Amino acid sequence: MAENRRMAAARVLKGITQRKLAELVGTREIEISRIETGRVTPAARLKQSIADVLEKPTFELFDN
């Protein structure tokens, strides 16, 4: 699995911590970390929730 550097970069640019993003999308901080490091691939619904919070289309944030 590829790292999701674009997701992490977008999160940092918005000034949102992993913890805050997790709260906003209804998951745990460790899950956000695992997504950003490529250890897990988020489900389509979670991808969309993250994209909505970061105000980016999913294809700009995720490799898959």
Give the location of each predicted region.
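Alpha-helical residues within the helix-turn-helix
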Residues: V12, E23, D52
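Short alpha-helical DNA-recognition segment
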Residues: G15-R34
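A short, Lys/Arg-rich alpha-helix, primarily the initiator
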Residues: M1-L13
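Key DNA-contacting residues within the recognition helix of helix-turn-helix
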Residues: A8, S33-R34, F62
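DNA major-groove recognition helix of helix-turn-helix/homeodomain DNA-binding modules
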Residues: R45-E60
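Short, conserved catalytic or interaction motifs in soluble domains
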Residues: T37
